[in-house]
């Protein structure tokens, strides 16, 4: 869909939207842009796990998720982060709707590797009908990084991968992956642009590592799927632009 911008919010930004963020969204909406928000909630999940004295473990930047962790993750993402984000947007006259009952019908997923990651999913399909219905009504859909498999089991999904899948399925004009750092850093400086052909070497040399790996991988997939622009940064306008080449 032309004029669609998909924004993934993570890190500190997922806990409190800045005035600058709100203003930019308002400007885009006034200019006729349609926006989808996808969010994670790692900080809140970590806090809830810590309170329950449960371990947090990551493999290749992805959170290992036991079945018993799912109620905690669901509480963090749907009950806290998503609800707060939606409320903040609505309070700023940005009409928004948090997907709860429709989420599992919209985000279809399957296990990545149950033995290695547990209840962590990869997106198999995005059913866009309900999202398009909301966008046509000038509403902002707010999606937590969760999905369901064919058996109706809840799966934890990396928010960067989910945002990429949503952007690709809607053929958005832009995907923005917001994080706590200014962009992809090399020698403590932000790289203004990264070509898809440079990515594997940057991972091999350790320039791209940890939680930045799924961001970059999802950015590359999105660019190659036909989405015009993918930006990684700590705001909506500047950072590292991922381009095909």
From Swiss-Prot:
Positions annotated to bind substrate: 41-42, 63, 156
Site (Transition state stabilizer): 8, 215
EC nos: 2.7.2.8
GO biological process, one term: L-arginine biosynthetic process
Alphabetical list of SUPFAM superfamilies matching this protein: Carbamate kinase-like (SSF53633)
Top-rank taxon, per record: Bacteria
UniProt key word Amino-acid biosynthesis: yes
Entry GO MF terms: acetylglutamate kinase activity; ATP binding
Catalysed transformations (reactions): N-acetyl-L-glutamate + ATP = N-acetyl-L-glutamyl 5-phosphate + ADP
Pfam families, per the entry: AA_kinase
Location of this chain's protein in the cell: Cytoplasm
GO CC terms, sorted: cytoplasm
Pathway linked to the protein: Amino-acid biosynthesis; L-arginine biosynthesis; N(2)-acetyl-L-ornithine from L-glutamate: step 2/4
CDD domains: AAK_NAGK-like
Keywords linked to the UniProt accession: Amino-acid biosynthesis, Arginine biosynthesis, ATP-binding, Cytoplasm, Kinase, Nucleotide-binding, Transferase
Protein role: Catalyzes the ATP-dependent phosphorylation of N-acetyl-L-glutamate.
Family: Belongs to the acetylglutamate kinase family. ArgB subfamily.
HAMAP family attached to this UniProt entry: ArgB
Name this polypeptide is given: Acetylglutamate kinase
This protein's encoding gene: argB
């Amino acid at each position: 869909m032309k004029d669609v911008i998909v924004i993934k919010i993570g890190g500190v930004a997922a806990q409190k939207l800045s005035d600058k963020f709100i203003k930019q969204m308002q400007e885009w909406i006034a200019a006729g842009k349609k926006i989808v928000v996808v969010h994670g909630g790692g900080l809140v999940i970590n806090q809830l796990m810590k309170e329950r004295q449960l371990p947090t473990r990551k493999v290749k930047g992805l959170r290992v998720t036991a079945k018993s962790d799912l109620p905690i993750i669901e509480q963090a993402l749907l009950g806290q982060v998503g609800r707060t984000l939606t409320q903040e947007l609505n309070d700023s006259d940005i009409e928004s709707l948090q997907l709860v009952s429709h989420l599992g019908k919209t985000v279809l997923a399957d296990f990545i590797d149950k033995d290695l990651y547990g209840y962590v999913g990869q997106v198999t399909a995005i059913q866009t009908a309900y999202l398009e219905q909301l966008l046509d009504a000038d509403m902002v859909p707010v999606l937590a990084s969760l999905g369901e498999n064919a058996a109706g089991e809840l799966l934890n999904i990396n928010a960067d991968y989910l945002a990429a899948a949503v952007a690709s399925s809607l053929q958005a004009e832009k995907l923005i992956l917001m994080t706590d750092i200014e962009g992809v850093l090399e020698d403590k400086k932000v790289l203004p642009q990264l070509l898809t052909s440079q990515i594997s070497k940057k991972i091999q040399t350790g320039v791209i590592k940890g939680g930045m790996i799924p961001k970059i991988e999802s950015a590359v997939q999105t660019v190659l799927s036909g989405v015009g622009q993918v930006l990684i940064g700590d705001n909506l306008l500047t950072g590292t632009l991922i381009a095909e080449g």
